[in-house]
Amino acid sequence: MAKRKYKRDSKIPEYEFYILDDVVHFILKGRAMVDGTYAAVNMDKWLIISKYEWFLGKSGYPVCYELGKIQLHRFVYTLILGTCPSGLYVDHIDRNKLNNTDGNLRLVTPQQNSFNKSTNTNKKGVKKISDNNYMATVVKDGVRRQIKNIPTEIAAAEIYNMMAEELFGEFAAFNKI
């Protein structure tokens, strides 16, 4: 498959956007325009960001191909503090890939980033082990912590949330109950 080359047009892209509390919310280009998917950045970054075309990538992150396929949260971080140190990731605190405001981005280790992962099932750390028994599991530093024989899935999710908060602190991803 041939690589597509993106040629920089001298024309600055036009965006549909609105400003709320010093945050610019703008519709991403491409398929996101049909859905009306908005990304958010601080006003002081907007003048630089708006010079490029930002698309909604397959991973759900806004991405710019003109800059060598960089994701928006990484680009914003470089505008704030410069290059991301080797071995660290730029993480969205609220886990919203479209919220790229300064206060929502932080540097994390790969392990901290893994604590903050979401699941599609809303049963993070919960497994059914028999008809009326569930298990809550948390793994940190290669050590598995489990509580078994929990009567309901909701109770197991609540127990997982408590264990995750204790072990992962601000990096914990919780089940919505």
Regions found by a protein language model. Give the residues of each.
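Conserved recognition-core residues within compact binding domains
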Residues: M1-Y89, R95-L167, F171-I177
